[in-house]
Amino acid sequence: MEPKRLFDCIEHQLKLFPQEVMLAAKENGAWRKYSTAEVAQTVNSLSAGLLTLGLSGNDFTPEGSDKIAIISSNRPEWLMADMATQQIGVIWVPVYPTTNPLELAFILKDASVQYMFASNKELYDKVMSVKEEVACLKEVFTFDRIPGAKHWSELCLQDADLLEQVNVIKKTIPVDQVATFIYTSGTTGKPKGVMLTHQSVYFNLQMGKKSFPFPDAP
């Protein structure tokens, strides 16, 4: 079946074109590789953990859906956290790593972000420097292991009941639900959030594929 929501793409690849190396990044000077199967498993287990935080899409409106933010450079965990968030109906709010603390606090409050991922100590410290003034922000999880911070792996749960809930919820996510808020850099004023739906982003992917053809094969 053709993907309709962004997170459908992982299952689509797993069924038709599973890769031994879907994602890769250097960790401590050595390449860490992730297969499609491992990515899919991690995404689902992270979704299960996010459910235990009480997060959901609620009524699937931009106002009613819960939000999770991320401040990070490009890395495999970014994609996996993104898909895990979206497939339970929660809106993803990426923040540029170069965003200053004032704009960061504004974005988190404006989007009513409840939880956040930060990639490393520098960005974690930046988030923690504004946390007290962002009343809606409950907790920050990190990709790197940082003393005193909660590591994102704590949220990856292999619980059969929770994983079944994730599968049920995935089927209910409408294609026209907002998948992400993308904030402008704020160079001419306060950052402004742009709402992008699953449908709109996936349509752009399909049009890009037609403009720059590549085969549906490994």
Model-derived segments and their meaning:
Residues 11, 76-95, 104-105, 206-210:
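Hydrophobic alpha-helical segments in the ANL/AMP-binding
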